Amino acid sequence: MDVSIEKIKNLRASTGAGMLDCKNALEEADGDIDKAVEILRKKGAIKAAKKAGRVTNEGIVYSYIHHNEKIGVLLLLGCETDFVARTEDFHDLAKKISLQIASMNPKWISREDVPQEIIDKEKEIYLEELKNSNKPENIKEQIVENKLGKFYSENCLLEQEYVFGEGESIKDIIDSMIAKVGENITVDKFARFAIGE
């Protein structure tokens, strides 16, 4: 299918992907913008996975203070080169992540960071809730796994749904940026401060 330059430009403006990637995604999606965005997102996740092992020795320490001056965030966002660290897009990403941390108060960066004793305690609580249920053991185990998944999505930054997004997780947003800049990007550390907490 031959796609118009206008559609390619619109897709590029909304995703930040390269012109050729936009053209190919639109052709694959038969001109459907929404399908093309989904294709680009999947390819972005693939690109991000390929770059995940690369070292991020550059980056920025980003600070955010909420307008009421009662919540603040310090974020260490890593990348591979100082060129990317200086871009407006990288700073915008740091701001988005900091807003997420300020509003959703995650406890850990990823599920791998959650201490095993906390996971065990959560499982114990969930199993106790199901103790008197007549459900088979395999169903109980599935319920516990689902509840753990919800626990991770509430408490792990990368798994949280972006507060200003449409079903995207923080990991999805980072993966899109990785695909755009061609470098690995990592959330290395964060700290959230709040008056009265």
Swiss-Prot record:
Entry's localization field: Cytoplasm
Region feature (Involved in Mg(2+) ion dislocation from EF-Tu): 81-84
Keywords annotated in UniProt: Cytoplasm, Elongation factor, Protein biosynthesis
Keyword Membrane attributed: no
InterPro entries noted in UniProt: EF-Ts_dimer_sf (IPR036402), Transl_elong_EFTs/EF1B (IPR001816), Transl_elong_EFTs/EF1B_dimer (IPR014039), Transl_elong_Ts_CS (IPR018101), UBA-like_sf (IPR009060)
One Gene Ontology term, aspect cellular component: cytoplasm
Family recorded in the similarity comment: Belongs to the EF-Ts family.
Record's protein name: Elongation factor Ts
Lineage, broadest ranks: Bacteria, Thermotogati, Thermotogota, Thermotogae, Petrotogales
